[in-house]
Amino acid sequence: MEDFVRQCFNPMIVELAEKAMKEYGEDPKIETNKFAAICTHLEVCFMYSDFHFINELGESVIIESGDPNALLKHRFEIIEGRDRTMAWTVVNSICNTTRAEKPKFLPDLYDYKENRFVEIGVTRREVHIYYLEKANKIKSEKTHIHIFSFTGEEMATKADYTLDEESRARIKTRLFTIRQEMASRGLWDSFRQSERGEETIEERFEITGTMRRLANYSLPPNFSSLENFRVYVDGFEPNGCIESKLSQMSKEVNARIEPFSKTTPRPLRIPGGPPCHQRSKFLLMDALKLSIEDPSHEGEGIPLYDAIKCMKTFFGWKEPSIVKPHEKGINPNYLQAWKQVLAELQDLENEEKDPKTKNMKKTSQLKWALGENMAPEKVDFEDCKDINDLKQYDSDEPETRSLASWIQSEFNKACELTDSSWIELDEIGEDIAPIEYIASMRRNYFTAEVSHCRATEYIMKGVYINTALLNASCAAMDEFQLIPMISKCRTKEGRRKTNLYGFIIKGRSHLRNDTDVVNFVSMEFSLTDPRFEPHKWEKYCVHEIGDMLLRTAVGQVSRPMFLYVRTNGTSKIKMKWGMEIRRCLLQSLQQIESMIEAESSVKEKDMTKEFFENKSETWPIGESPKGVEEGSIGKVCRTLLAKSVFNSLYASPQLEGFSAESRKLLLIVQALRDNLEPGTFDIGGLYESIEECLINDPWVLLNASWFNSFLTHALK
């Protein structure tokens, strides 16, 4: 790698990178991947600045060669590449002359045209993840962030890419060339995998002085220092049988081990009450898409323009009316909010400027829907600590809900195939080792089975919505920003397709902590009449907004089109996990792999091909009241994926608790089926801990119902 760096980069860049590494006590000969990363970053900073000037009229111009006497000023001040002292001197000088806010961290450039500092990022990972790490580290809206990746993707604050397309294309081409050169020398994989997240001060935090002495004093007996204790804790592995653990417990604990037989377990008690309601962040089986094929309109790829183009494909709009009110809400406000969206989209079309984002007017209906000024006033603890009867307010127990049939229908629909492909095969290089060949083969077979699955559509929809909402929450904290809900796919014929599901309007979003909540109003198109299952739509106000002509076997029929509107909320940590929902593909692939491995070890050869291509064989999918359901290997792949996706979409403390506690009972039942004669104590306590998680969550209630079916058939 070191040789490659010296051949590939300009000697001046190499020298600057060496200096920078030595300044931090790092050796370019040892940390070669870091050496390459620093050189790449330096080169991108220089390319970003190259040929960009400001003329005597204060306009930004691009001049690659010309009159050396022209009165031109460099548009960008390069800060990256200077030693720290000099770099801070330059930053201070800029702040003094331009009145710019002083950044906490050294930026890479200063843009004299836009009057802002610029942070350049070059990542080997996904751009949105690296962008968020940068934004979280910098924590300043004044510094503009621009991220490039080696795959040609880029991301910038407020989608403002600063430079013209040609300048950015030069940078992307150079990065792609570096990647190809590395790959041809077998260096790329190591370089790609070596990238770590943004380091923070906390990671290098050392306990010293008084705190160190206090830490050493507060250790358990027999430990002389914190280091010794850490080593012990890191290497600690509990072992020993149940009886020996019980003997160490208090003498007051009276635990007698009871035999566990087929008659011991009882079904889980599923609560009664009104039927459970839909609580996912966006509509699933009931969603309706307005789509455009082979998009080539002006501004294609900018969500706002994609959305307007999709809206224009529908001609059946009519005066909206409420068909299912929200019991507790001010329903006319939701109606006015939709009318406001339509009006402001129309205004956008009439404007001469082309804004990339749309901030809604802060009308009374939106303020109400987004909970503006509704948060209770915070009082400093110092001002009220002397109040004698200060206590936490009483909160009611959550109302229990019964299992409703709609959640099983949702799950069945998620396992079905659609007529579009939602994921592409990854462009990964040639396989070198035999194990890579097998892994690629499995991945390709699996991708073929799930690429058209509706659960995969939910994945891509979830990634888009969470990414867009988190970006808007960071970039436009005080604004009520309009965010289209968009996904992209390919038709059977391979044509690109852009889909619009509806819109989100986000509220104020000063998200300091991971759990701070941002409110949003979702408005989603649907053909589902809410009056058939009103309990499912308890949290929604539903409007009829148009009539859609549908082609059927008997000709065209007109169906009413509905808009499902609700106030919702999410947090930074939930959005981060929502962006990671692609991991569900990996989890379900690993489950399939373990099935293939089990089969391969019996046959003593790799069974991947036979596993996927033997269409006559069926596999167990799950339990139902009828018994064990079986299906093709493709159905198994899609069912496992749908379960993983629903675990993400319906994530909750109830699900966490139910999964952890029911697993214990599952293992005991499995041990009984394997004739291992399991023994238990306090089985009643285990049932209690499982059933306290069965409250009102639809996905948990469905899993409990499946668990009961499993118990019935497993113990026959």
Curated annotation (Swiss-Prot):
Subcellular location: Host cytoplasm; Host nucleus
InterPro entries: INFV_PA, PA/PA-X, PA/PA-X_sf
Entry GO MF terms: endonuclease activity; metal ion binding; RNA binding
GO CC terms, sorted: host cell cytoplasm; host cell nucleus
Keyword terms of this UniProt record: Cap snatching, Endonuclease, Eukaryotic host gene expression shutoff by virus, Eukaryotic host transcription shutoff by virus, Host cytoplasm, Host gene expression shutoff by virus, Host nucleus, Host-virus interaction, Hydrolase, Inhibition of host RNA polymerase II by virus, Manganese, Metal-binding, Nuclease, Phosphoprotein
EC code: 3.1.-.-
Posttranslational mods: Phosphorylated on serines and threonines by host kinases, including human casein kinase II.
Motif Nuclear localization signal 1 (NLS1) per record, residues: 124-139
Residues making up the signal peptide according to the UniProt record: none
Pfam family, one: Flu_PA
Sequence positions that bind Mn(2+) 2: 80, 108
Chief location of this protein within or outside the cell: host cell
The UniProt record lists the keyword Metal-binding: yes
Enzyme's top EC category: hydrolase
Motif mapping: Nuclear localization signal 2 (NLS2): 184-247
Textual note on the cofactor: Binds 2 manganese ions per subunit.
Residues bound to Mn(2+) 1: 41, 108, 119-120
Subunit and partners: Influenza RNA polymerase is composed of three subunits: PB1, PB2 and PA. Interacts (via C-terminus) with PB1 (via N-terminus).
Family, as annotated: Belongs to the influenza viruses PA family.
Name of this chain's protein: Polymerase acidic protein
Lineage: Viruses, Riboviria, Orthornavirae, Negarnaviricota, Polyploviricotina
Gene from which the chain derives: PA
